[in-house]
Amino acid sequence: MKVTSLKIPDVKLIEPDVFEDERGFFYESFNQQKLNEAIGKNIAFVQDNHSKSSKGVLRGLHYQDEPFAQGKLVRVICGEVFDVVVDIRKDSTTYGQWVSEILSAENKKQLWIPEGFAHGYLTLSDYAEFLYKTTRHYSKQHEKTIPFNHADFDISWPEIDAQITLSQKDTLGL
C-alpha cells in the first residue's frame, strides 16, 4: 500500500498493491493497522455506506458538525468520479483550500478524509458505485452541505457531456 500526502497534507491518497494474473486481480482494500500506521493515528470506523450515481450526478459538499464530525475512507468500486475535499477547519493553515482526485474502479485509489473537511464528487462514467467508511455515525441534526459552486472555494469541476444533477439539499446548500 502506498500512501501519499496531497496538497493538503492531512488528506491522504492510498494506492493499494494489486496482484493481477490471467484469473483477474486481488488486493487488500482495507487494513486497519496499515492505515493507522500510514496516517499516524488510530482510527476506528463505525459505519460503511454505499451509493450509486448516474453520470452527471454531483453529491456534496457534505460534512457533519462536532460532536459528529466524520473522517471518511472513500473509494469507487464501479465507474469513475471526480472527488473533491475542502478544508473547512477555521484554524488550519490550509483553510479554504481544496484537493481533487479521480477515483475509479480501474485505478483502485482511495482517499482518507479527516474530520473537519467537506467532501463531494461528480460522477464521470455512465454510473459509479461509491463506498465509504466513516468514523462517526450519520447524524441528521449535524449534517451540513456547502454548495458545490461556493465562491470562496472556486472549485474547478470538470466539464462533462451530461447535465449536472443535484439533490434539492445540495442545490440549496442545506
Question: Which residues does each predicted region cover?
Answer:
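Non-catalytic, conserved peripheral segments adjacent to functional cores
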Residues: M1-E106, Y127, T134-L174
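Conserved metal-binding segment of the jelly-roll/cupin
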Residues: L103-Y127
